[in-house]
A protein has these predicted regions:
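Alpha-helical metal-binding/catalytic segments enriched in His/Glu/Asp
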Residues: 134, 150-151, 155-213, 373
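Metal-dependent peptidase/peptidase-like ectodomains
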Residues: 206-318, 323, 327
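Conserved aromatic anchor
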Residues: 399-410
Length: 470
C-alpha cells in the first residue's frame, strides 16, 4: 500500500453548528504516517526513572520471608504475628500500599476484597481469600469512572498444591508480579500530583491463583457486577527474568486472547465473517503495549504472543477475559521450570538446585518490566476515552471507506489507524481532526481499520475497530 496515494476527507455531524462543521470538514494537509512512529510524554518518561530495582528486591525478599504464601497456609492472628503464611503477607502488602499513600499525600485508597472459597480440588475446606488493592482516583470527574488495572498474585506454592506449611518461596511466581504492582503504585502515586491522570488506576495483588485463579475470578466478577468501566488489565505473572543462559533480558512476552472468551456464538460468527479473529479488545491492548514499548525506553521490549497463555498453564488475566474485559499477561521470555512449583532442594546426582528462590530472579529485569507496565498505565490513564459507537458504512458497493463515531471525553482530535489483514500490528495512521466522521480512499475489503482518540498532549486511547453498518 502506497500511503502517498491515500486521500482523507473529514466530515462533521449534520446537526452541529455551521462554524463547527466548517472546522471539522477541513481536509488534513499531512499525509498518513507510519503507525510505528513514537510519541512520548516527557513527564511520564521522568516518572519511569524512579522505578527502583532495590525496592523491587526488598519486596521480593520480604514476600519470600513469609515462608509459605499458599492460599491454604495459616492466616490466624498467631501466624500473622509470627510473620508466616499468607495472612502475614496480606497484611504487609496492605501496609505497603498505605505507606505509599502517605508518601503521596493520601492519593491512594487502600481496600480489600475478602470472600470465602468453598471446598474444591485444591481447597480442602472453606477458605478465606483476600485480594488487596489500592485505587488512584482519576482527576477528571468526566473520566474518573474509566479504570485501568495492574495485578500480580501474592500466593505461592511448592511441588504439592495442598502443602501450606513447607517452604514455598515463590520469588518469581509470583512475588515478581506483585512487586511490579506495588512499584507501579509507589511511582505513579508520587507522579500523580504532576501528571493528574484523568482516569483511575487500580493496583491489585490477588490471592488464590495457584488454587484455581480464585482471587481474580472473584475480583473480575465484582467488577462486572458493579459495572466498572475497566478498559485494561495488565497481569504480571513470572516476570523475574530468571538468570538462565538462554534468557533474553531484553524481551517480555505479552499474551492476549484472540476470540473473546465472553463472546456469544452470534458474535463469534460475526467476528469470523469480518475477519476479526485478531482484533479482540485484549489484542488491541497488546498492540497498545507494543506502541508504548516503542515510545518509552523501559529497557525491555514486548514480544506479542497471539494466544491466551502458554501450554499447560493459565493466569489471572483469563478471569477478566471471562467477564468481557481486555486483559493480557506479561511473562519472562524463557522460563526455568526447575524454579517454579518445586520443593526447595538440591539434587546431588544432577547438581540441580530446585526451588523458586530470590537468587534466581533478575531484579533489574523486573524493574524494566515494571517501567513498561507503568508507562502503559500512565498513557492509558492520561488518554481520552476510547471512541464509542464506531461504525463503518457498508450500504454501498464502493472502494472507499467511511467511518463514524461518537465524541470522546477529553479528546481534541481523532486518528484512524489501519493495517493489512495479514499484518500483526497497525501500519498507518492518519489524523482526522476534531470531526467524528471520516472518508478514506482506502478499500475496507483490504485492511482492518480502527479509530482512537487523542488529547492535546498527544496521549492516545485504545483503538476501537468499527462495526459494519448499512
Amino acid at each position: 500500500m502506497e500511503i502517498a496515494r491515500v486521500v482523507i476527507v473529514v466530515l462533521g455531524l449534520a446537526l452541529v453548528p455551521w462554524g463547527s462543521r466548517c472546522r471539522a470538514e477541513e481536509t488534513p494537509t499531512e499525509p498518513p504516517r507510519l503507525a510505528s512512529d513514537p510519541h512520548t510524554d516527557a513527564r511520564i518518561a521522568e516518572a519511569l526513572r524512579r522505578v527502583s530495582p532495590d525496592r523491587i528486591r526488598q519486596t521480593i525478599e520480604k514476600l519470600v520471608a513469609f515462608n509459605n504464601r499458599s492460599t491454604i497456609s495459616p492466616q490466624d492472628e498467631a501466624s500473622i504475628k509470627a510473620g508466616k503464611g499468607i495472612g502475614a503477607a496480606r497484611e504487609w502488602i496492605k501496609s505497603e500500599f498505605e505507606r505509599y499513600s502517605k508518601d503521596c499525600g493520601g492519593c491512594l485508597e487502600v481496600k480489600t476484597d475478602t470472600f470465602t472459597e468453598q471446598p474444591a480440588e485444591r481447597i480442602p475446606s472453606p477458605t478465606e481469600i483476600t485480594n488487596v488493592y489500592a485505587v488512584l482516583r482519576g482527576s477528571d470527574p468526566k473520566q474518573a469512572e474509566r479504570m485501568v488495572l495492574v495485578t500480580g498474585h501474592y500466593d505461592s506454592r511448592n511441588s504439592d498444591p495442598l502443602n501450606g506449611t513447607d517452604p514455598a518461596p515463590g520469588a518469581n511466581d509470583d512475588a515478581s508480579g506483585t512487586a511490579v504492582s506495588l512499584e507501579c503504585a509507589r511511582v505513579l502515586g508520587k507522579a500523580s500530583a504532576q501528571l493528574k491522570f484523568p482516569a483511575t488506576i487500580i493496583f491489585l495483588a490477588v490471592a488464590g491463583e495457584e488454587q484455581g485463579l480464585d482471587g481474580s475470578k472473584h475480583f473480575a466478577q465484582m467488577a462486572k457486577q458493579q459495572s466498572w468501566k475497566l478498559e485494561a488489565v495488565l497481569n504480571n505473572d513470572i516476570v523475574g527474568g530468571n538468570l538462565g543462559r538462554d534468557q533474553d533480558a531484553g524481551i517480555v512476552r505479552v499474551f492476549s486472547e484472540g476470540l473473546p472468551a465472553a463472546a456469544a456464538e452470534i458474535e463469534i460468527k460475526r467476528i469470523r465473517m469480518l475477519g476479526g479473529e485478531s482484533d479482540s479488545a485484549s489484542r488491541e491492548l497488546a498492540r497498545y503495549i507494543a506502541d508504548v514499548g516503542r515510545s518509552y525506553d523501559a529497557g525491555v521490549k514486548p514480544l506479542l504472543v497471539f494466544r491466551l497463555d502458554r501450554f499447560l498453564r493459565g493466569g489471572d488475566h483469563s478471569s477478566f477475559n471471562q467477564q468481557g474485559f481486555a486483559a493480557v499477561r506479561f511473562t519472562e521470555f524463557r522460563e526455568d521450570f526447575n524454579h517454579q512449583h518445586q520443593n526447595v532442594r538440591h539434587d546431588d546426582a544432577t547438581g540441580i538446585e530446585y526451588g523458586d528462590l530470590p537468587k534466581f530472579v533478575d531484579v533489574d529485569y523486573v524493574a524494566r518490566v515494571a517501567r513498561l507496565n507503568a508507562a502503559t498505565l500512565a498513557m492509558l490513564a492520561s488518554a481520552p476515552a476510547p471512541p464509542a459507537g464506531v461504525k463503518m458504512q457498508t450500504k454501498n458497493l464502493d472502494n472507499d471507506t467511511t467511518l463514524a463515531w461518537e465524541p470522546s471525553a477529553g479528546a481534541t482530535a481523532y486518528e484512524v489507524v489501519w493495517r493489512s489483514t495479514n499484518a500483526a500490528d497497525w501500519e498507518y495512521v492518519q489524523t482526522v481532526g476534531r470531526g467524528t466522521r471520516a472518508s478514506l480512499k482506502v478499500s475496507k475489503d483490504n485492511v482492518i481499520f480502527a479509530v482512537r482518540a487523542v488529547d492535546a498532549a498527544g496521549h492516545r486511547s485504545l483503538p476501537v475497530v468499527p462495526e459494519p453498518e448499512r
